Amino acid sequence: MFCATIAPLYSTDFGYLMPEKILIAVAWPYANGWLHIGHIAGCYLPADIFARYHRLKGNSVLMVSGSDQHGTPVTIRADQEGTTPEEVVEKYHLSFLETWDNLGISFDLFTKTGTSNHRETTHEIFNTLLRKGYIYKKIMTVPYCEHDARFLPDRYVKGICPNCDNQDARGDQCDNCGHPMNASELGNLTCRLCNQQISIRDSEHCFLSLSKFESDLKTWLSDKDGWRPNVLNFTRKFLDSGLKDRAITRDIQWGIDVPMQGFENKRIYVWFEA
């Protein structure tokens, strides 16, 4: 998956079309495993072809992406390999760079979410939304493993999806139907680390008021007839079912810190910051 923004520039003095500015924003791979042919065929090769085409036309192209280094995908891999999240992301980030070089994928910038600039930008966005009233605190129920004595965010739990009955849904989304959810909504909750039943505890988190954007998003979407039908229908389905406010912090120690007092032991949810 990649997004492209095209900005044509016209010369008012000579009346001809000047080179366009093309921004190609390519999906960020999680730095928790090796790339495979599906990654390349799915987004990186198409994006590279698009970039090369516009460079040949003489346009100014900026193709960017980076390693998604935070969240439970990385910490679970570290648990599996008996190492640290830092070592995991460094290993796989370097492997990504080697892959792009071997395949000739022509990124202008391939960065990572572990930079100080990314942290500062995330904090700036978080604080702006907080100041404007789009972020609020609320106590929610969170899975907790008594055996491992730890909270279990997102991919640390599995259970039955309430939307499609998939038996192996994750704690933040069902990969079978794409339905986003809180982990406590799953049926038959089980810890992925020890495969034991888990309990539910209260934990305070920050929520993003997605519901406040629903009306404006529907208006914005109303004239997007040029989108592919499946993309348009998928987006409309979420809006028609009603946007729900989502927790954007997690009980985890790996990730970007939350710029709020009382949240020192939590981190910003990877989908918010990446």
Feature annotation, model-predicted:
Residues 125, 157-160, 170-173, 213, ...:
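Internal, well-ordered alpha-helical segments in soluble enzyme and binding-protein domains
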Residues 19-65, 117-121, 190-274:
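Structured secondary-structure scaffolds
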Residues 19-138, 149-150, 162, 226:
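N-terminal Rossmann-like or analogous alpha/beta NTP/dinucleotide-binding catalytic cores
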Residues 101, 131-134, 179, 196, ...:
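Generic secondary-structure signature for well-ordered alpha-helical cores
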Residues 48, 72, 94, 159, ...:
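Residues on a specific face of well-ordered alpha-helices
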Residues 134-205:
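Cys/His-rich short segments
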Residues 5-16:
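Short, positively charged and aromatic/hydrophobic N-terminal segments
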